[in-house]
Amino acid sequence: MPPGARYSRHEAFSSASLSTAVSELSVETREVGDVTLLYPRGFINAHTVRRFEGEIQKALEQKRFKLVVNCEGLTYIASAGLGAIMGAIEEIRGNGGDLRLAALNETVRNIFEILGFHHLYRIFPSEVDAIRSFRDAPAAS
């Protein structure tokens, strides 16, 4: 763990069935300098999106406007998850920050490409590349 990094772990489960894989999501967060990293694991859908939104909102309440969503553990993202990202981006970019995506698997990457989200958000092959991008270039506007 890098110096100064902080972790938190939260889990959300659908009330319909804890055993249904599509209803499970955990979100870990970590801070590296002025960048907040989010690690969603599982599925972001209508049953789990509040946990994901809550972690984004916590970062914004702490005036942390540089976010990287590491999608390595994300199995699937439904429209509710995409809406959570879209819902936060105006505030993030309005405060000089950005939300960047890293380590997308093929399924998640295809969803973003089909919907044209790869034109709206910077996508990086690794978390390290996404973090570095905040130092190398200004935030999107």
Model features per residue range: what roles?
Residues T20, Y39, E72, H119, ...:
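Residue-level signal for pocket-adjacent positions within structured domains
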Residues I123-S141:
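A charged, well-structured terminal subsegment
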Residues F43-Y121:
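Amphipathic alpha-helical interaction surfaces in cytosolic regulatory modules
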Residues P2-Y39:
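Short beta-strand/loop segment at the start of cytosolic alpha/beta domains
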Residues V32-D34, E72, L104, V128:
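Conserved catalytic submotifs in the C-terminal HATPase_c
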Residues S26-V27, T107, R135:
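Short leucine-rich amphipathic alpha-helices used at interfaces
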Residues R30, A102, F124:
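General small-molecule cofactor/ligand-binding pocket signal
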